[in-house]
Amino acid sequence: MKRKLFLLLLLFVGQYSVFAQVISGQNGVRDKRPGYYLFKNATIHVDPTTTLDEAWLLIKDDKVEKVGKSFDIPKGTVVVDLKGKHIYPSFIDIYSDYGMPELKRGAGGRGNFYEMKFDSDKPGAYAWNQAVKPEVKASELFTVNAKAADEYRKIGFGAMVSHVKDGIVRGNSVLVALSSEKENKALLKSNVSSHYSFQKGLSTQTYPVSLMGSVALLRQTIYDADWYKKTKASTERNLSLEAFSDNLSLPSIFHGTSFHDALRIDKIGKEFGIKYIIKSGGDDYKRLDEIKALSTHLILPLNFPKALDVEDPIDADGVALADLKHWELAPANPARVAESGINFSFTASDLPLKAAFFTQLQAAIKAGLSKKDALSALTVNPAKVLQIDDQVGVIKSGLLANFLVTDKDIFEEKSKILENWVQGEKFVISDISATEIAGKYTTTIPGFK
């Protein structure tokens, strides 16, 4: 009897230990068989400087298992012949708000000059100004957005670093995968970077009302956080200042709208010993030597200006020469930045229509940007600058199985993304087996010459 009870107890404990490894819930039976896929005979772009011809890629579940040529494969592996196709690492966008709550403006603090509002509406032991919110943690707000994820996957992205784009001090970000998995699986890393800007955003308080006020508020917050940390909160608790000090250990990203902002941001950083990664306004070419001297990483937008309407002489007379010059020179900004030796990455966040991404990228390449620099700006550069290259950025054993299958060189005109694999999950973008029917044909009708 005791022996039977012991065996039953052992069986129960064994089952519990297995199920205890599973954290998130799932309806139905879990399939724990390893999912091996082998992609062979493809041109594999392991990273921007390494390309393997007629190579093999083996993945297991959500990770890369092996990259090379003609190696032994596990039993039960699904083999996919990709002869003539190309494989690239999926792209990374480190300046996104994917999966973040929609920002909605509340009443008050705007528009009526005579209604001055100085107190914060936010309850709790937080900063006195609503535009200062370092306590915001993107990982706690992240929810999978299927529609937005699909838009990004179609243009080659597999991972995003997201934060709430609101306020002068915006809190920290989260690294997420663009898979269809639940948040528990899609969330890859919390507390990736801290974020700042000169825009007060949705704050309903009157102050600040100018760029000068925004700079003053940020500087005062830095001084306050330093004082608060040194006094060890001897007088009162302030959760915002505590979070601000904690976030200083993270890579810091500052949103700028022009080269003027970039120079201004660096000046603030030097005052307090902070090296900011700068979200560029796309006009760095105007002061390239000064920007290069900052020795920082730039996040470049691809929202180049549309052609100006100058057909009507009256309309043309109202177009500023500076606007015409920027329209002509903006597509060359990435190439100029690369030629100067400035480290940079790209973001698609400023594009109203995400489908225009490759059109804009092609414009940058035609203006002189090399394919190597373009791929670096979408893969290894963003991964390294935010220290997430242990998970994404290249096709390497142990990293996430985030990769693209394309019909040819991805930076050639009219190239197609056929599949985007994210965390080992296949997303079909274009039918890989579709027959190409474009070409010149001769029609023959019986009885006619």
Please report, for each region that a protein language model flagged, where it lies by residue.
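Bacterial Sec-dependent N-terminal signal peptides
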Residues: 1-26
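Histidine-rich, glycine-flanked metal-binding segment
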Residues: 22-24, 29-35, 44, 48-90, ...
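Acidic, glycine-enriched loop/beta-strand segments at the rims
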Residues: 25-31, 44-56, 68-69, 355, ...
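His/Asp/Glu-enriched, well-ordered alpha-helical/loop segment
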Residues: 33, 41, 104, 111-124, ...
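Tryptophan-anchored aromatic micro-motifs
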Residues: 37-43, 433-449
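Polyanionic/metal-chelating signatures
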Residues: 144-283, 416, 422
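Active-site core of metal-dependent hydrolases
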Residues: 163, 232-330, 344-345, 366, ...
